[in-house]
Amino acid sequence: MLTNSRDIIRRLERDGFVLKSVRGSHHKFVHVATKRMAVVVHPKRDIPIGTVHGIYKDAGWERD
């Protein structure tokens, strides 16, 4: 499971998410087809595991 914000952002973009807005350290990504939204705190090397689980759920990913 990815815990680094850069790696999570790369995977979001690879899976069809685009950056919609940034407010402070919160980057909002929206999927172009499904309109799912995921918010990633960036830059942060080690995101808490509970937050990572929430990002995975918002993105529609299965846990690794």
Task: For the regions a language model picked out, list residue spans one by one.
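Basic nucleic-acid-binding interfaces
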Residues: 1-22, 26-64
